[in-house]
Amino acid sequence: MSVRVLITGFEPFGGDTANASGEAVLRLARRFDDPDLELVHAVIPVSFLGGPETLRRLIAEHDPDVVVAVGEAGGRSAVTPELWAVNDQVARIPDNDAAQPSGPIDAGPQRLASRLDVDALVAAVRQAGIPAESSEDAGRFVCNAVFRAALTGFDGPAGFVHVPAVREGRTATVGAETDAKAPVQSDLTFDDLATALDAIVRASATCGG
């Protein structure tokens, strides 16, 4: 029986016309082929309300064995699987629904740990020739809210991965809006990110197999 992996990326936001996470997920889906793995993919809204709601709907609709949510982060030059989601939201800019919330997300604990083997994900991405490192900061924007929803709305293996906010032929504006480390640039391409996500999907599937 194949392992079904749900992977999501995000739509553009903050004045950008692209989002590296959504682009990478779409490229991965076009080329992914494995008889032992079923890949379900989606691009979800950059919305504190709509992002988590869409993820929960996808989980209910597809009944995945594993959930991997992906977002982009300005200022990062490596693929960074996140260690935990925090119970906090701080919107430096409005989301795509013009919402700018602040405060706790839910009544749960301050931190919820990823239910994926983060060290194994890092090793798999590096083995594919892409720089990777673990991260202790999923931010306080919609990425963290969706990560939190994956952990609270799904009982199985679930986690979140940030990819660098790369663009084709220009610089992402999102970095300055959401990440204090925005000046850092990455030489990675969308195809490189798809390669990294391929490795992550395969490594994550061992958690749900």
Please report, for each region that a protein language model flagged, where it lies by residue.
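A solvent-exposed, charged loop/short amphipathic helix patch at secondary-structure junctions
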Residues: V174-V184
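N-terminal catalytic or cofactor-binding beta/alpha core of small enzyme domains
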Residues: M1-R140, L151-D155, P183-G209
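Active-site oxyanion/phosphate-handling segment shared across diverse enzymes
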Residues: A138-E168
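Short active-site-adjacent structural elements
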Residues: G15, R167-T173
